[in-house]
């Protein structure tokens, strides 16, 4: 069964709140926005998505939330959203147990709150803020000026071109591979393995605060007080390790 909604109004902000299933977000060549929900035959119509457009903001909600308390989350459904190009400026996505695929995005701001499930991102996002609990998160060919990642008990591998990176990692393993030199890096990790890979560069100053755990660095550095300085030392890195491992690696 397929439920399709076509939205002609101008939408600059998208807010999505969704549970289980596959969620895909893409751009298409049309000036309108399309929401397509596919379900099995037994899916009750009263639980089809709810949407509302107000002042350029589109809200899409999963109506199955109401029945979750009864444990009736057997109704399988997938969601695909087709966005017009050069229109959406910001997106807020909350997914619980869903597999999110948002590819080729061209937006200013993306906020994602992702609980379990898998997430794959690509495209150009100026400011990207991700919070993930128990999730698996990855990206390819992703360009982000600011990348802020709060990860708890999650695995992640983000590949792309990043400038300002802010990490808060608790448990499991997070890897960041940047094809461009970072402008700044802040990392607080607790009982986690964190790897940040950057290309050869003109220099950085890295302040390492280590309560327990291990710090490893692939770049040749000299010490200035509590700082490790590579070449001209211009870029500022701060690494706080509260157990686990942190590796600053050479991106070949």
Residue ranges and their predicted role:
Residues 1-252:
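Intrinsically disordered, low-complexity terminal regions
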């Amino acid at each position: 069964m397929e439920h399709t909604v076509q939205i002609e109004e101008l939408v600059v902000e998208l807010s999505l709140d969704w549970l289980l299933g596959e969620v895909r977000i893409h751009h298409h060549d049309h000036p309108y926005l399309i929401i397509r929900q596919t379900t099995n035959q037994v899916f009750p119509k009263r639980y089809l998505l709810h949407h509302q457009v107000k002042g350029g903001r589109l809200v899409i909600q999963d109506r199955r939330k109401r029945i979750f308390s009864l444990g009736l989350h057997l109704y399988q459904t997938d969601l695909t959203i087709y966005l017009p190009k050069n229109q959406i400026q910001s997106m807020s996505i909350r997914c619980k147990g869903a597999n999110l695929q948002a590819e080729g995005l061209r937006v200013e701001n993306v906020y994602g709150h992702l609980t379990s499930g898998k997430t794959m991102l690509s495209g150009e996002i100026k400011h990207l803020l991700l919070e993930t609990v128990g999730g698996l998160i990855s990206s390819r060919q992703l360009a982000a000026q600011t990348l802020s990642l709060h990860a708890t008990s999650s695995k992640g591998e983000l590949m792309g071109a990043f400038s300002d990176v802010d990490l808060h990692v608790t448990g499991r393993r997070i890897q960041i591979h940047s094809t461009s030199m970072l402008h700044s890096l802040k990392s607080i990790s607790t009982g986690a393995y964190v790897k940040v890979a950057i290309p050869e560069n003109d220099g950085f100053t890295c302040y390492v605060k280590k309560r327990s755990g291990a710090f490893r660095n692939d770049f040749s550095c000299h010490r200035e007080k509590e700082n490790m300085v590579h070449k001209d030392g211009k870029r500022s890195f701060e690494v706080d390790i509260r157990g686990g491992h942190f590796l600053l690696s050479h991106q070949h």
